[in-house]
A protein has these predicted regions:
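Flexible "stalk/tail and boundary" regions
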Residues: 1-13, 17-18, 26-98, 105-147
Length: 147
């Protein structure tokens, strides 16, 4: 299942005539897996693709902190994180039997391109999609510098 293991590496992919993207085999996705397209935390023409269960787990952890923590700062941070997660989620989709995922018109509009070519990087439990190769290369450069 997508997200059960760390996803590393980068790849480029195109869309077929029905706006479907084929996920690489190392993402370990299966037919029927539900994923969520979210606005990226970097906010620069990028979309994050998370398994639905990861989003659900993050929200559950935030709820638990809100209910159990006695530290007001932690409660406020958990509320803000939950708000950010819920407001960034855009579209849910299913992965089909041939490992294809439909890229919704809203997602293509947010990525700001009419192109059918996307640049992707796997990061732990998500895939980050870029439509702009320069932004992708810039992000990869910054990612390696951070480590």
């Amino acid at each position: 299942m997508l997200g059960d293991v760390a996803i590393f590496g980068n790849f480029s992919c195109g869309l077929d005539e029905k706006s479907r993207m084929i996920l690489p085999s190392y993402t370990e996705c299966e037919k029927g897996d539900r994923v969520v397209f979210c606005i990226s935390d970097i906010g620069e023409e990028a979309i994050d693709l998370y398994p639905l269960f990861v989003i659900s787990d993050l929200i559950s952890r935030c709820d638990e902190l809100i209910l159990t923590s006695t530290d007001e700062t932690i409660v406020m941070r958990a509320k803000e994180e939950k708000r950010r997660i819920c407001s960034s989620a855009l579209v849910q989709a299913n992965i089909d039997v041939q490992r294809r995922l439909t890229v919704n018109p809203l997602i293509r509009e947010i990525l700001g391109t009419d192109s059918n070519k996307y640049f992707c990087i796997g990061e732990n439990n998500r895939i980050k999609l870029f439509s702009n190769e320069e932004k992708f290369k810039e992000y990869i450069g910054h990612s390696y510098i951070k480590r």
